[in-house]
A protein has these predicted regions:
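Short hydrophobic/aromatic-rich motifs at helix boundaries and adjacent loops
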Residues: 14, 76, 178-179
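Catalytic core of tubulin tyrosine ligase-like
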Residues: 108, 112-117, 125-129, 134-294
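Conserved beta-loop-beta/alpha segment of the NTase-like Rossmann-fold superfamily
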Residues: 52, 57-156
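A general secondary-structure junction signal
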Residues: 35, 64-66, 262-264
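N-terminal glycine-rich phosphate-binding loop and ensuing alpha1 helix
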Residues: 1-58, 69, 80-98, 105-106, ...
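A structural signal for isolated positions on well-ordered beta-strands in alpha/beta enzyme cores
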Residues: 30-32, 61, 145, 259
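Short, internal active-site loops enriched in acidic
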Residues: 36-40, 123, 266
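Residue-level signal for inorganic ion chemistry
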Residues: 43, 122, 203
Length: 295
């Protein structure tokens, strides 16, 4: 709970977007929620307990994200406590494959869905239904569009939009040198200054095309409990294994072009990454209340 409006969960705040759209356009927009194997049951029970936030139950569908095996530093696949292959979620880029495996794309087509907004649950200011976003995409005649923010400063740790081999892409902050970070164009703006905030919209045609083309995998060094060859359960104190995941922005490289809509940070970005500190429940609550209490 964020402790706002009062004590609304992030899911309820997002659902409010959809209920507002119902008021404005007299239609219940389908809501597809990707969960993980670990939290799927708990998430569904949470919705049931809260009466689906008074949104039609048949308009909300859950589907489970895919997983990939984890490997140790020796390259061998790890086993979990039950002695079976240890797996981890395959990243938010796995949404395309998961949508096909769980018949989500088919359901969308049967419901006449043409545009799909894909956004995070951990941002209470995310706009689930943005008329301007879809309007720009249609006007520019592209199959995808993403939202961006101007970087807070050259060294802000965010991925940024760019062109790679003539196609849209996002370059991660770890790949941006100090020189690149400070580089400016003739108007004095940062060359690498359009932050990707993981709020994207895809045409169903793009979803189908991307879903039939594998995205690259990235490795992340993580700490994971596992069973060793003797059958002992090992709980490491430091990272000991690699998980593999794909990122949603890697899908941009599958497209010839896409549009970017720059938005205001104060109006659309209040990420929740922890309980306290930067990008926390505390800061998100403050940003959310500040936005909704504007005169």
């Amino acid at each position: 709970m964020l402790g706002i409006e009062p004590d609304k969960s992030l899911f309820e705040i997002l659902c409010d977007n959809l209920k507002t759209a119902k008021t404005n356009y007299d239609v219940y927009i389908p809501w597809y929620i990707m969960t993980s194997r670990e939290n799927n049951k708990q998430t569904m029970e949470f919705f049931e307990k809260n009466n689906y936030f008074n949104y039609p139950k048949d308009k909300i569908k859950f589907f489970i994200q895919g997983e990939l095996p984890m490997v140790g530093t020796d390259g061998k696949i790890l086993l979990d406590k039950e002695g079976i292959i240890k797996e981890a979620a395959d990243g938010h880029g796995g949404i395309f494959e998961a949508m096909f495996k769980n018949n989500v794309v088919e359901d969308m087509k049967n419901n006449g869905v043409e545009w799909i907004f894909v956004g995070p649950v951990d941002n209470p200011l995310v706009k689930m239904v943005d008329e301007i976003l879809i309007g720009v995409a249609v006007d520019k005649k592209v199959l995808a569009i993403g939202k961006s923010l101007v970087k807070a400063n050259p060294k802000e740790k965010v991925g940024v939009f760019c062109k790679k081999n003539g196609k849209p892409a996002v370059i991660e902050y770890t790949e941006i040198s100090d020189e690149m970070a400070e580089e400016k164009d003739k108007n004095g703006n940062l060359v690498y200054g359009e932050s990707h905030i993981n709020c994207n919209m895809f045409n169903i045609k793009a979803i189908e095309y991307i879903g039939n083309n594998k995205l690259p995998y990235h490795s992340a060094f993580k700490k994971a409990t596992y069973m060793n060859e003797k059958g002992d359960i090992i709980e490491p104190s430091e990272p000991n294994s690699y998980k593999f995941e794909s990122f949603i922005f890697d899908s941009f490289q599958k497209l010839d072009d896409m549009a970017i809509l720059r938005v205001n940070r104060e109006e659309e970005f209040a990420p929740v990454k922890g309980k306290t500190g930067v990008d926390s429940v505390e800061t998100a609550r403050e940003l959310y209340n500040k936005y909704h209490n504007r005169s």
